Regions:
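Selective transmembrane helix interface/packing segments
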Residues: 2-324
Length: 324
């Protein structure tokens, strides 16, 4: 029986020590090691345009541009696809227990399927793919926002307001810092800001509304699959309207409230996810501009769990409504 090779546990500590040493050399204890004061990134509600050339133009709507939140969406899609491929290969390999990321994803999927089976019963196989896909997509988009530097690496552009000075680091690569701080009144020097290449798509209302609409539409689809055309009586029940006018009027009012309830689900889904993730991103921006290392580390951990919880909540609400 061959002896298992010893794992070099010390190597990870060397890497960790090198990272910490680099942080201290470049930023110092409180981010002022090289005299470069951290700056506060500009906060934009909509996704920022990466290119000034529109992708295409829709008559009556206008031009659609490539934005940094679209980059976040494409990366989140890629992550979900790669996870699916990795887990599929791990299962086909015949291993009884998967390890690493594949094992963690398998455990998460088993947990999600168990929840679906306990809630949806015989409809679990039809509902689970939607539940799992939405959960994993939102989770990937939330956690991509925790990659350090994603909000500070991008395109420098002129900013008509409180911007910063631009300085060339080396050929074709620039930085902005506080030393040429924003245009003061009467100062005609140019000021600049950064448009990040990537921004978490869950901080864009367009994505959260689109995902909310998909979720609510699938709730209606599952309703028709389960009850047929009788599902419409949930919204328009006039069976007793003439035989028992009082009860018929009450049923009609309840149906009207159900219609309002379905539309309110879209608002609830969209603003809950957007509000939590956008607020978390702004919080990390602010703390990173004040104390660049230690304070943001705590909030990164907080946002790690917020991203996980929000993804599961969004998926579970969708699954629960589809199972009703």
């Amino acid at each position: 029986m061959s002896e298992k090779p010893k794992r070099r546990v010390w190597a990870r500590w060397v890497v960790l020590a090198a990272i910490i040493l680099g942080l201290f050399l470049f930023t110092g204890l409180f981010g002022i090691g090289l005299g470069i004061k951290p700056i506060m990134p500009h906060v934009y509600l909509p996704g920022e345009k990466i290119s000034e050339v529109p992708l295409f133009t829709i008559p009556g709507i206008g031009s659609l541009y490539y934005t940094n939140t679209l980059t976040g969406l494409l990366l989140a899609d890629l992550v979900v696809i790669l996870i699916a491929i990795g887990v599929s290969r791990g299962i086909k390999s015949g291993k009884m227990v998967l390890g690493g990321i594949s094992g963690a994803v398998e455990a998460l999927i088993e947990m999600l399927y168990g929840i679906t089976e306990g809630t949806a019963g015989k409809w679990s196989k039809a509902i689970f793919p939607w539940f799992a896909t939405i959960t994993l997509l939102v989770l990937a988009s939330n956690w991509l926002g925790l990659i350090p530097g994603n909000e500070t690496i991008g395109i420098i552009h002129e900013y008509d307001g409180h911007g910063y000075a631009k300085k060339e680091l080396f050929s074709g690569v620039y930085t902005i810092w506080d030393e040429g701080e924003a245009k003061a009144e009467g100062d005609h020097a140019e000021s600049y800001a950064i448009i990040p290449f990537m921004r978490p798509v869950s901080t864009d209302l367009n994505f959260t509304f689109a995902l909310a609409i998909v979720a609510v539409v699938m709730v209606q689809v599952m309703g028709f699959r389960a009850q047929g055309m009788g599902y419409l009586t949930k919204f328009w029940n006039v069976k007793h309207f003439f035989s028992k006018p009082i009860f018929g009027f009450i049923d009609w009012g309840v149906g009207l409230l159900e219609v309002i309830s379905e539309f309110s689900k879209i608002l609830s889904f969209a603003f809950r996810l957007f509000g939590n993730l956008f607020a978390g991103a702004v919080l990390i921006f602010v703390m990173g501009s004040l104390v660049p290392i230690f304070a943001p580390a705590m909030f990164y951990m907080l946002e790690f769990f917020v991203g996980l919880i929000q993804a599961i909540v969004f998926g579970m609400l969708t699954m629960t409504f589809m199972a009703q």
